[in-house]
Design a protein with these regions (language model features):
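Short amphipathic alpha-helical signal-transduction/dimerization elements
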Residues: 39, 86, 150-161
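Short, charged, low-complexity patches
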Residues: 31, 141-154
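Gram-negative outer-membrane assembly/targeting C-terminal domains
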Residues: 157-184
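Charged/polar, solvent-exposed surface patches and flexible loops
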Residues: 76-80, 84, 151, 155, ...
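Beta-lactam-recognizing serine transpeptidase/beta-lactamase-like catalytic domain environment
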Residues: 1-141, 175-184
Length: 184
């Protein structure tokens, strides 16, 4: 950041960066791992593709818990806020009956249409999944990222979609997303 701002950080720079604007760069995998860290109240496991290799030991780098320097009690506050976002905030479309989903929307500004972003995890107190969804050029995080993330979490956690969710999934499959165009 010092290179980008030539050492001239100010209050506006800090505010802008704190909401993810400016030079904040993170991949969807990094955002999902952040969600996993919040879900686990302060630890994550290094993302990896291979779960096991027959008759082989996986390097402990990929199986051990890596703890942050932030106390678990602080993550609880963040998780509660993310739960409230699903109950009564911008993540309401992430509600899945019988599952306590926690989430956070995002809208990544772009030269064209904004990108719809969602980060979430579930269940709140015994997390099984953390997810990040980016849908380019479609607008607010609540428009696409949240409902698509909820569908993916429901499928993963329940092994299937409810009839209502199946209809929603079909509707999103039929929508035209105008990548790279000024029209929606």
């Amino acid at each position: 950041y010092d290179k980008a701002y030539r050492g001239s950080w100010n209050g506006l720079t800090v505010i802008s960066i704190s909401i993810g604007q400016g030079e904040v760069n993170a991949t969807p995998l990094q955002i999902a791992n952040l969600g996993a860290t919040i879900a686990n109240r302060g630890y994550f496991i290094t993302p990896h593709v291979v779960k096991q290799i027959q008759d082989e030991q996986i390097d402990t780098l990929y199986t051990r818990r890596r703890y942050t320097m932030v106390e678990a009690r602080h993550y609880e506050t963040v998780a509660q806020g993310m739960r409230r976002a699903v109950l009564a905030g911008t993540c309401r479309k992430a509600n899945i009956p019988g599952i306590e989903v926690c989430g956070k929307t995002g809208t990544a500004q772009n030269r064209g249409h904004d990108h719809s972003v969602f980060m979430g995890f579930a269940p709140m107190n015994e997390p099984k999944i953390a997810i990040a969804v980016y849908v380019e050029n479609v607008g607010w995080g609540a428009d696409y990222g949240v409902p698509l993330g909820a569908l993916m979490m429901e499928q993963y956690l329940n092994g299937k979609l409810s009839p209502e969710s199946e209809k929603l999934a079909e509707m999103y499959q039929q929508r035209h997303i105008g990548y790279g165009t000024a029209d929606r």
